[in-house]
Amino acid sequence: MTKWFAYILLASVCLLLSCGGKSVREKFAEADRLVNENNLDSAAWLLEEQITLSALSDSDKAEYGRRLAWLHLLQGRSLVNDSLIDYSVDYYKEHASEPLLSAYFVKAIYMGDSRKGLEQRRALYREAIDSAYSRSDSTYLVRFYDRLTSLSFGEGLYRETIAESKEWEASPKAGFKEMAYYMAGLSYSRL
């Protein structure tokens, strides 16, 4: 009889403890609030210590990877260990989700921090530009063109930088054309 009582008591305590916590979405909202208040360390603690990755659904896992990598970027931390951003980009591409462009942006920075190959990073920017163009998102279109031309220029690929700058300049949806002219001019001066 005491054995059954102990089992019932243990089950009740477990049930009581499991009901008291916030949902993952509430924790994400709380982390967003902390980031907006510039409490980055508290937001990092919340995401890194209070969320169990193995218990997340696929969509929550993608969101977790994107948010954590973005937070590390805001903190100025290296993104070398944020390989979950790969999962986030793949998930958002597969489901045509809204956060895809910000995930691309963070993944490109992650690839730079982890010293991925130049062609891989250029291909990622190309893919991101296509996605931003199809969504008519001029903000991310400018960001991705800027990063792509800067990457190419930094690697000494001046002819490619000129071609990318001309493409940027010809794009009806991308703004900041003066940056495209500037990158093309710099590249012409190096030929």
What are these regions, as identified by a protein language model?
Residues 1-6:
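Positively charged n-region of N-terminal signal peptides that target proteins for export
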Residues 7-16:
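Bacterial N-terminal signal peptides
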Residues 19-191:
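A "functional boundary" signal
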